[in-house]
Amino acid sequence: MVNTATNTGFITQIIGPVIDIEFPNGKLPPIYNSVIVSDVTCEVQQLLGNNRVRAVSMTSTDGLKRGMEVTDLNAPISVPVGKSTLGRIFNVLGVPVDEMGEVSMETTLPIHRLSPRFTELETKPSIFETGIKVVDLLAPYRRGGKIGLFGGAGVGKTVLIMELINNIAKAHGGVSVFGGVGERTREGNDLYMEMKESGVINASNLSESKVALVYGQMNEPPGARMRVGLTALTMAEYFRDVNKQDVLLFIDNIFRFVQAGSEVSALLGRMPSAVGYQPTLATEMGTLQERITSTREGSITSIQAVYVPADDLTDPAPATTFSHLDATTVLSRNLAAKGIYPAVDPLDSTSTMLQINIVGSEHYDTAQDVKETLQRYKELQDIIAILGLDELSEEDRLTVARARKVERFLSQPFFVAEVFTGSPGKYVSLADTIKGFNMILNGELDELPEQAFYLVGNIDEAIEKANSLKG
């Protein structure tokens, strides 16, 4: 921890969140050390020569002036980790900001750590079962993988995130860490309130909560937004490496991490790269992403919301992110408008795990048949709109009927949405999911009405619902 021999310098220049500090000869703090001046914590980013360093502030530099004394803390920023973090909200420095009292600093870790060695990695790819039918069947997540979550406002990103947090806790005995990177303060507050309401955070007994929250919102300096992802990741690494758990790490939004790095890079005087981004874009992204992985002890599976500026997928920020992703989950406004939740687009969502040698032939064939049926239905929709269903061939009418059942069967009641829908949530195993879709596509359930498949768990519930509709 902190060395007792204090090393002090003084401020020579302040430009916004960037501070130049002069230290005594031979006492320069190394890069990434944290230094503190009048309650403002900064991180050393550059050694300038002439005994001066350039540091980036993690909080506002209001009130600082030249000549003020700066203390080197002789260590990088360190944050609390472990069970005491569950149910709490932290800032980039690991300080609780939820007015729920202090957090035990008994166990802390520095936010800058090396990624696991190759010998520690779990090399055999395995599926991370979420209990959500559409995800597990059509775009399965890799244990220790990275998933991009794409979707506009109001299509159900937050509810999907909360359901995943709930399911990993129940099915895998795991915990989650949520890193709010450069998003709206209001959204962070709404998420916290919804988590309390749905039981993901247990306000009366915090140790039973399933998630720790780390926020660096868009009103904060770029230094905080650039480092808050590392703070969340450090907390997740402790649960993986020490508690040997499966961890879900949510980063909302990974684009803001890049954006903050771009701001800091410009403030540090680096020459910009393509589209004005930092020249170190790939390195910064790689440093974060390489720490998110499976080891033999546990795993960190990361779900990252990806904002695509001006819907341009070739922009360097999303393009760099894509190279790290194992799967993409795309939320569709059209499905949300139809009331099909989760509104995951079955044709746009992809996964590198959907290969015969990984998931097996039954899973692979079922997924391809489902996609084929839905694609054919999509192609026929224009004809149906112009000429009507009666003008289709017998075979196409059957395809449409089955596709509509498949589409409805991809919906599912969520545990965290129980308070809104009144329907109890359902966790559906992968085997049950495959069995259900096979029965629909094989024509075994052609006589059942399509509304029987809407918002049910496994196929037995759909059959039961059909019987109650008849009765």
Curated annotation (Swiss-Prot):
Complexes and interactors: F-type ATPases have 2 components, CF(1) - the catalytic core - and CF(0) - the membrane proton channel. CF(1) has five subunits: alpha(3), beta(3), gamma(1), delta(1), epsilon(1). CF(0) has four main subunits: a(1), b(1), b'(1) and c(9-12).
InterPro entries: AAA+_ATPase, ATP-synt_VA_C, ATP_synth_F1_bsu, ATPase_a/bsu_AS, ATPase_alpha/beta_chains, ATPase_F1/V1/A1_a/bsu_N, ATPase_F1/V1/A1_a/bsu_N_sf, ATPase_F1/V1/A1_a/bsu_nucl-bd
Source taxonomy: Eukaryota, Cryptophyceae, Pyrenomonadales, Pyrenomonadaceae, Rhodomonas
EC number(s) recorded for this UniProt protein: 7.1.2.2
Catalysed conversion reaction: ATP + H2O + 4 H(+)(in) = ADP + phosphate + 5 H(+)(out)
Example GO molecular function: ATP hydrolysis activity
Enzyme superclass (EC): translocase
Protein name as annotated: ATP synthase subunit beta, chloroplastic
GO BP term, pick one: proton motive force-driven mitochondrial ATP synthesis
Subcellular location: Plastid, Chloroplast thylakoid membrane
Organism encoding this protein: Rhodomonas salina
